[in-house]
Every structure is written in structure tokens, then in C-alpha cells.
Curated annotation (Swiss-Prot):
It comes from Bacillus subtilis (strain 168). It comes from the Bacteria. Induction: Part of the rapH-phrH operon, which is transcribed from the SigA-driven rapH promoter. phrH is also transcribed from a putative SigA-driven promoter embedded within the rapH gene sequence. This is Phosphatase RapH inhibitor. The gene is phrH. It is found in: Secreted; Cytoplasm. Disruption phenotype: Decreases expression from the aprE promoter. GO terms for biological process: establishment of competence for transformation; sporulation resulting in formation of a cellular spore. Changing residue 39 to A: Retains 10% of wild-type activity. GO terms for cellular component: cytoplasm; extracellular region. Keywords: Competence, Cytoplasm, Secreted, Sporulation. Changing residue 37 to A: Loss of activity. Residues 26-57 are annotated as: Disordered.
Length: 57
């Protein structure tokens, strides 16, 4: 039992570290793009809302 527990702990640790390091290594560019997209969307949303209000009024 203790050996199995050790193996499970090692697997869990590697999984956690893998999931933490993988996005930073592979998707650093993709991550930046998505955050940029989010900020631009947030920046443009007030203008879109005001346009909608103008169209309604």
C-alpha cells in the first residue's frame, strides 16, 4: 500500500506541475492573444452599448 501511495503522489505532483508549466511553455503567445482580445472587447463594449441606445431612442 505505501508504495502505491508514493506512486500516486508522484503522479499527482507531475500532473499538477505539468498542467502549471504546459500553458506557460506552449501557449504563451496564445495566452497573450486571448488576453488582448478580451481587453479590446471590454474597451469596445461601452461604444457598442451607446450605439444601441442611440438606435433605440
Amino acid at each position: 500500500m505505501p508504495i502505491k501511495k508514493k506512486v500516486m503522489m508522484c503522479l499527482a505532483v507531475t500532473l499538477v506541475f505539468g498542467s502549471m508549466s504546459f500553458p506557460t511553455l506552449t501557449n504563451s503567445g496564445g495566452f497573450k492573444e486571448s488576453t488582448d482580445r478580451n481587453t479590446t472587447y471590454i474597451d469596445h463594449s461601452p461604444y457598442k452599448l451607446s450605439d444601441q441606445k442611440k438606435a433605440l431612442s
